[in-house]
Amino acid sequence: MKNLILAIESSCDDSSIAIIDKNTLECKFHKKISQELEHSIYGGVVPELAARLHSEALPKILKQSKKYFKNLCAIAVTNEPGLSVSLLGGISMAKTLASALNLPLIPINHLKGHIYSLFLEEKISLDRGILLVSGGHTMVLYLKDDANLELLASTNDDSFGESFDKVAKMMNLGYPGGVIIENLAKNAKLKNISFNTPLKHSKELAFSFSGLKNAVRLEILKHENLNEDTKAEIAYAFENTACDHIMDKLEKIFNLYKFKNFGVVGGASANLNLRSRLQNLCQKYNANLKLAPLKFCSDNALMIARAAVDAYEKKEFVSIEEDILSPKNKNFSRI
C-alpha cells in the first residue's frame, strides 16, 4: 500500500530525512545529521560549507531509508525560507527522487513545518496564537480557525536565536550559542550586571535585539580580562533580558487577542528559561500552552513530513520542472 511520504529538510545546517504514514501519522523513519561541530570554529553557519556537508550527508541518510521506497506516495521538501545553497541540495534530491519514482512533489514552507511540530501525531488544531523563535526568525502569529495566518509581531533586526549566537561569538564561546549561553548563565555567581529591556516603553508590537546585543558588546569591552565568572554573569544578564523582552511583548499581545490556546515552536524555544516564563504567562491568562517536543524544536524533516500530509490531502503538488527555490518567506499566509 502506497501510503508513505518522504520529506527532506536542508534549509540551514541540519541534513534530515523523514518518512511518515499519511494515514496514521506514524513516523516510519527519521534521521538527522547536524553540522554544528563543523561550523563551531567559525562562530556561525558558513553557507558554502553547509552546502558541501548537505551533499555528503543527505545521500547517506537516504540510503538508510531505501526499504520504504516501494510504499512511497509522494516526496516533500523544504523550499523556503533558508540559505539558497542549502535549500538547493534538498530540492535537487527531492526532484530526482520524484522523477525516478514517478511520484508527486510537495514543496513545504520551513516555518509552516515548525508549526506542525506541535501536531506531529495528531490533527492540527486551529484558533491559536503561536510564538516562533529560531536562529532566523522571531514572530508571533495568529493561526485563525479558517487556517489563515496573521502576523502579529516580528523582529526589526536580529532574531532571538541569532542574538544568542552573536553574544556567544563575542565571548569566544563557540556555536550554536543558545545552549552555550543557557548553560553558562546557570553558573553565574554574581548578578550585578543588567541590561535595559528593548522597546520596553514602546507600544509597537515588534521585537528588536540589536540594541541589547550592542549593550553586551559594550559590557564586554569594560573588562580587560574576561574571566569565566564574568562571562557567566554577562550570559545570565543577557538571557534574562532577552526573555524579558519576549514576555513583555507577549503580555501586550495576550491583552489584545485573549488567546485560549497558544503554541511555541522553533529551535530557540528549547530555552528552559523562556519555556518556564511562557507556562506562567499562559496560566495567568488561562490559555492552554502547547510546546513543541524538545527533540523536534530544532530543524528536522519529521515536521516537514507532517506538514506534507495535509498538503497531500489538498493536492498541493508542483511540477519537477518548476523553480520552487525561495530563500525568502513567500508562501506563508495559510496552513
Curated annotation (Swiss-Prot):
Gene Ontology CC, one term: cytoplasm
Subcellular location: Cytoplasm
Molecular function (Gene Ontology), one example: N(6)-L-threonylcarbamoyladenine synthase activity
Cofactor note: Binds 1 Fe(2+) ion per subunit.
EC class name: transferase
Residues reported to bind Fe cation: H110, H114, D299
Key words, A-Z: Acyltransferase, Cytoplasm, Iron, Metal-binding, Transferase, tRNA processing
Cofactor: Fe(2+)
UniProt-listed GO biological process terms: tRNA threonylcarbamoyladenosine modification
Residues the record lists as binding substrate: L132, V133, S134, G135, G136, D165, G178, N271
Superkingdom of this protein's organism: Bacteria
Catalytic function, reaction form: L-threonylcarbamoyladenylate + adenosine(37) in tRNA = N(6)-L-threonylcarbamoyladenosine(37) in tRNA + AMP + H(+)
Pfam family, one: TsaD
EC number, as in UniProt: 2.3.1.234
Family listed: Belongs to the KAE1 / TsaD family.
Functional summary from the UniProt entry: Required for the formation of a threonylcarbamoyl group on adenosine at position 37 (t(6)A37) in tRNAs that read codons beginning with adenine. Is involved in the transfer of the threonylcarbamoyl moiety of threonylcarbamoyl-AMP (TC-AMP) to the N6 group of A37, together with TsaE and TsaB. TsaD likely plays a direct catalytic role in this reaction.
Name listed for the protein in its UniProt record: tRNA N6-adenosine threonylcarbamoyltransferase
